[in-house]
Regions:
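Positively charged n-region of N-terminal signal peptides that target proteins for export
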Residues: 1-4
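Hydrophobic h-region of N-terminal signal peptides that target proteins for export
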Residues: 7-17
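Non-catalytic all-alpha helical scaffold/repeat segments
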Residues: 15-461
Length: 461
């Protein structure tokens, strides 16, 4: 059915007036944009950005207006920044939820990036309204750390592309970067700022000034161990090495940077540490004399299956993947009507599981069970039934109100799965587009009209 989306896009492009405006099919595009604006902030902004990035939208004025709306709406997103598991690898299904690009910082920076292609002055004005990262301290129990790299990538892009020759001569790009080079208050900012400096096109004296500002801030910053251990070893260490190499290439003395880096490591490693951070290998080595002042708790995985009903369903799940002989069921065995009947019984039991005392555990655990079911169910009617059942549960779920990003993650993966198999998932595709939930319906229609490339979605699965 994707041919329909391509036909609509072709119609939008073909109906553009000489000035670039969409005429005949204007209502198709404008209806989607109007519906998007009525959604909660992050869903509205993301949908508008997808529309603004559509190749068929050649009307620059219309695109500009949509980008401005998306930028303003993005400020109301529930999540201020992207997040990731502190180890660098997803520890649970929902760690990926915070990498969907639905946080305020990512959405606003994306709007700025898109605006830069059509109006660099407006893009610069918009970026000036993006709040610089002020990152909350985390506890050892937190499994997710903040990722603000998009902000500093965008700052570097502004310095490189958002100024004319006179403004460059007046050192305005340098002043922009100087504003952020020394504004280091959390370990989560260290690597992004260092990389921003590495890629900056600057005169030697300007580079030295930024380097000095960054090193001075690095010498003073003291962050929580969870944020620190989420970047060292690994991201921060590599970024400092890259910055040192850039200093060598420019023949600039990096001793001040290295001294600040070593002082930073000593300060963090001798402070309060998290138990799982201390146990992690490899550890930065500063000698036997550097020991933690205290060793506290460890990260708590979210959405564990603790309730009796959840544990019961988890036990019953094994009958769908393991036969009486103790061996895993083959794809051929799962294609039988007998297995299909057991799946339907299990789906009925899953549907009867109502919310527990802990809404986070309930939503995450039930979503994980649906995800596991999808992975073991062969293509065909049973998989289509499974996705339809999941849709019914999601579209009436109150979890969306306070946990939009997490609620949308299974919605997003459901849309990706369904539209990746238009023949086998025809019923689910139609149900998604006709959903009573306005977010689900609009995003399904966007997927039909503006399908995302697999490279952009595979990491979410």
């Amino acid at each position: 059915m994707r041919w329909l989306g391509y036909l609509i896009l072709a119609g939008l492009a073909a109906s553009a007036a000489p000035g670039g405006s969409v005429t005949k099919h204007r209502s198709v595009f404008d209806d989607l944009a109007d519906r998007a604006r009525s959604l909660p902030a992050e869903f509205a902004a993301n949908a508008l950005l997808r529309l603004a990035e559509a190749p068929a939208l050649t009307d620059v004025a219309k695109k500009r207006g949509i980008l401005e709306d998306a930028f303003e709406l993005a400020a109301g997103a529930q999540q201020p920044f992207a997040r990731r598991n502190w180890t660098g690898s997803p520890g649970s299904l929902f760690d990926k939820a915070y990498a969907q690009g639905l946080d305020a910082c990512t959405l606003q920076c994306r709007a700025v990036h898109d605006m830069l292609a059509i109006d660099y002055r407006k893009a610069r004005e918009m970026f000036g309204e993006v709040q610089p990262p002020h990152i909350p301290r985390l506890d050892c129990e937190d499994a997710l750390v903040y990722d603000v790299s998009i902000f500093y990538v965008t700052a570097g892009e502004m310095a490189a592309r958002a100024f004319n020759a006179k403004e460059v001569a007046d050192e305005e790009p340098f002043q922009l970067l100087l504003r952020y080079a020394g504004d280091l208050t959390s370990p989560a900012q260290l690597a992004p700022i260092a990389r921003m400096l590495v890629t900056a096109s600057l005169k030697p004296v300007q580079f030295e000034a930024l380097l000095g500002s960054f090193a001075g801030a690095l010498e003073q910053v003291e962050g929580d161990d969870r944020s620190f251990s989420g970047t060292v070893p690994g991201d921060a260490s590599a970024a400092i090495a890259d910055l040192s190499a850039e200093c060598a290439r420019r023949k600039i003395n990096a001793q001040g940077l290295q001294a600040a880096w070593q002082a930073y490591l000593a300060r963090q490693l001798s402070g309060a540490r998290c138990a799982d951070s201390v146990a992690r290998r490899p550890q930065p080595s500063l000698g036997a004399g550097v020991k933690p002042a205290s060793i506290d708790g460890k990260a708590q995985p979210a959405g564990e299956c603790k309730s009796p009903e959840c544990r019961k369903l988890a036990t019953q799940f094994s009958s769908l993947i393991v036969g009486p002989n103790g061996f895993g069921l083959t794809p051929e065995q799962k294609m039988t009507s007998e297995w299909g009947g057991r799946l339907q019984q299990y789906l009925a039991a899953l549907a009867e599981w109502t919310e527990d005392d802990d809404p986070v555990e309930y939503f995450q655990a039930k979503s994980r069970i649906y995800s596991d079911l999808y992975n073991v169910t062969p293509n065909g009617p049973n998989r289509d039934l499974l996705l339809s059942t999941l849709l019914i549960w999601l579209q009436g779920n109150s979890y969306q109100r306070d946990h939009r990003v997490e609620w949308f993650y299974p919605v997003n993966t459901l849309i990706i799965h369904a539209f990746a198999d238009p023949r086998g998932m025809r019923r689910t595709m139609l149900a998604l587009q006709r959903s009573a939930d306005p977010v689900i319906a609009l995003y399904a229609q966007l997927e039909q009209l503006l399908p995302r490339p697999m490279a952009g979605t595979i990491g979410l699965l």
